Amino acid sequence: MDNALEFVNSRLGTHEYWDKFYDEELTNFEKNGGEGEIWFGRLCEAKMVEFLIKKASKDAIICDIGTGNGSVLRKLSNCGFLNLFGIDYSYKAIELAKNISSKNYSNNKIKFLLANISEDKLESELKGKFDILLDKGTFDAISLTNKSDLDDEIPRNELINLLENELLCFDCELPTNNNFEFGGCKGNTYIGCVFKWRG
């Protein structure tokens, strides 16, 4: 693909990094009850939830890919969404998400599952199950993986296999050219994108 984005390898693209990160987050939660990092901030998460409230049925079967601590799913649950799943390839992330949800959200029925979309072996029980997929950072992590360790087609194919009929995928990590400067630092804002798959 001539216009493909080029990313450099980074420790953020390694399984070891995320296991260590979520091990520390889990320790912090057990010590002080803090839920930990909200990737791209609460505003980004709020925009995802706001969009889904407007556009999706409360009965839609939603999967958060790379769920981390499960924060966005808890927000959706609080807004009345009923069929929520979070998958992550880090066992510690899944343990953290389950612990937070069971301790702080006693009525929460979110299902958290250990799964790796960058491997061609997702559990058959997940295939063809979901109406909506959410991504708030997983594309970044996959893009930063050592390319010799990753077949570029597998994540795309595995995502398609997760879907029942149509895909509504909310990806809120794509950088824009909208630059700004504040306090002597330069930065970019982020945008949200929704993709609909018709197979």
PLM regions: where:
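Preference for well-ordered, secondary-structure-rich cores of eukaryotic proteins
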Residues: M1-G199
